[in-house]
Amino acid sequence: MAQAGPTPQQAIARLRAEIEQHNIRYYVHDDPSVPDAEYDALMRDLQALEAEHPELVTPDSPTQRVGAAPLAEFGSVRHAVPMLSLGNAFDEEDVRAFDKRVADTLRGAGLLGLDQQVEYFCELKLDGLAISLRYEEGRLAQAATRGDGQTGEDVTANIRTIKGVPLRLHGAPRVLEVRGEVLMNRAEFERLNRTQAARGEKVFVNPRNAAAGSLRQLDPRITAQRPLRFFAYSWGEVHGLPEGMPTRFDEPAPGVRVASTLPRDTHGGMLDWLAELGLPVNLRHNHRERGADGLLAFYERIGKLRADLPYDIDGVVYKVDALPSQRVLGFVARAPRFALAHKFPAEEAVTQLLGIEVQVGRTGAITPVARLAPVFVGGVTVTNATLHNEDEIRRKDVRIGDTVIVRRAGDVIPEVVGPVLEKRPADAREFVMLTACPICGSAIERPEGEAIARCTGGLFCAAQRKQTLLHAAGRKALDIEGLGEKLIDQLVDADRVKSLADIYSLTAFELAALERMGKKSAENLVAAIDQARRPALGRLLFALGIRHVGETTARDVARHFGSMERIMDASEEALLAVPDVGGVVAGSIRRFFAEPHNREIVEQLTQQGVHPQAEAEPEGTSLAGKTFVLTGTMPNWTRDEATRRILAAGGKVSGSVSKKTAYLVTGEDAGSKLTKAQELGVPVLDEDGLKALLGL
């Protein structure tokens, strides 16, 4: 019998939890855990589900606020006017839809004629840290980070060290709250990293990371040494215009006049006013445009200038210029209706392939990695990029010494796209796969029919042991916060941790003695380990790192059997009774628990007080148990987005067409899967058909 998929409430809860974790990494720790595109897709999925089920919307949903709570080390500041984020556009269709919504609303309010186009103020989307500056009686009184949009961190002392931030404004209102971005120029970033490296100190990943880390120093003297810049781009609370400044009236509707607290009636005019007060405003590339065509032309123009700018941008921002129109359009909980951020795609660059090394994964997978001459791409300096596997290297004809195209896929994971053949040197060398593991010396074998070669050393191999532990501590497994790669490296290298069970015997005393671990950090890690003593059964099964057993399969197996003991003792036939578990997965689980060492680890976990909790059965949905296969390129949804929506509705997604396939979803260049589906009589849907099936 097919297992029921998650209810809308469960799907929403899962998405909220995942987004909140990403928010903490991005907003609090300045350490993004996923590409922007993946985060945006998660947020769109949650917004879609909440739109379908408004009764499930709660005030603490990520769609109702921005970011995450501030760190405890800084004082908290409550924003008088919330610091909202912006809605995102990723393609032309999104921009045109935004312009149409704005125009329709303004025409309905009598503020735009039928033959008129909306006028927008277009700006660069600076890639730094959002900051609010509060001036009282013309003096800088307080500075705060965005935080969660409602409450931020007090960074006044650090902001005062930035030379471009005025400590006093002349002719300012009694209260003026200025919003803007703190950033670091690329040239200054490179210079800072060279200095850091020469001192043996931490180097930063990119200018945004450097700016955020510099601003959030507890010691303002460190911030003062960093080359930070500030640009104002908006405002919050404004009260008490100076005497002598005439009162200005807005007309939010025909015949209605309202006194305004602002000295100008357009967004661009307000930025000019802020500049007149002495605040740094990035006016050089800002421009007014009309209608969607004007917005898209601005986007294209800035895209061509992007590489020549002295600082990083990750898109452009469109704002309705007229402030009365902005007030009519208003806000949703998370973003203004009158503004939109249009993001740039990933970047590509050309550099030299200096060499190819291999990395050993937790299952022994050998992954070739390109060592590159440093190149700035997608906002970071890239020196390594994935080559995936030996077959991929052959397919792309990449050779050591080649000039190669590097793409920062998803703006996070760099990959080698291919060689520039006309620049290939005469001494370019082909890659030859190693025959022995570079870490443990065990034989490297490539099973017949597989693309990936593997080290045969198992947990004897320190590299596999490290990756296994890192996997187990991860967010989708045991979620042990603070147990990261560098700490695991130290524990394995010292032979202190040989298996997952050893993690639970660690003490704060011995952890505090490790590099970069103080007493408080050690105590926090021990507390996180203690919290992981009662994981969901599926999480613990996933944490064991059984080959072919992913997060979803682990959860399905856990729900089917109910206890680790029953899973360990299950025959291959019993495992095959679990929906969507085939011979490969069943055999892999059976072989894993047939190994005495692995059973011993589970017993050791029990002795360390690890008691997994049974998985709850999900309630049924209309797509529960139905298997989908995706092929080709859909016009609007990415494959990942379509997959997430199917899973959220209770369906399953497979990589190959079979008699068990309920639907094949196709886009352009569908290929052989479409042919096979037609042969088997599998129903075929396009993107619109899938949306209809999902009730969208």
From Swiss-Prot:
It catalyses: NAD(+) + (deoxyribonucleotide)n-3'-hydroxyl + 5'-phospho-(deoxyribonucleotide)m = (deoxyribonucleotide)n+m + AMP + beta-nicotinamide D-nucleotide. NCBIfam families: dnlj, PRK07956.1. It comes from the Bacteria. The keyword Transport does not apply. DNA ligase that catalyzes the formation of phosphodiester linkages between 5'-phosphoryl and 3'-hydroxyl groups in double-stranded DNA using NAD as a coenzyme and as the energy source for the reaction. It is essential for DNA replication and repair of damaged DNA. NAD(+) binds at residues 36-40, 85-86, 123, 146, 181, 319, 343. One of its GO terms (molecular function) is DNA binding. The gene is ligA. GO terms for cellular component: cytosol. One of its GO terms (biological process) is DNA replication. HAMAP family: DNA_ligase_A. It is an enzyme of class 6 (ligase). The active site is at 125 (n6-amp-lysine intermediate). Signal peptide: none annotated. Residues 618-696 form the BRCT domain. Its EC number is 6.5.1.2. This is DNA ligase. Gene3D superfamilies: 5' to 3' exonuclease, C-terminal subdomain (1.10.150.20), 6.20.10.30, BRCT domain (3.40.50.10190), DNA ligase/mRNA capping enzyme (3.30.470.30), Helix hairpin bin (1.10.287.610), Nucleic acid-binding proteins (2.40.50.140). Belongs to the NAD-dependent DNA ligase family. LigA subfamily. It comes from Bordetella bronchiseptica (strain ATCC BAA-588 / NCTC 13252 / RB50) (Alcaligenes bronchisepticus). Keywords: DNA damage, DNA repair, DNA replication, Ligase, Magnesium, Manganese, Metal-binding, NAD, Zinc. Zn(2+) binds at residues 437, 440, 455, 461. Its cofactor is Mg(2+); Mn(2+).
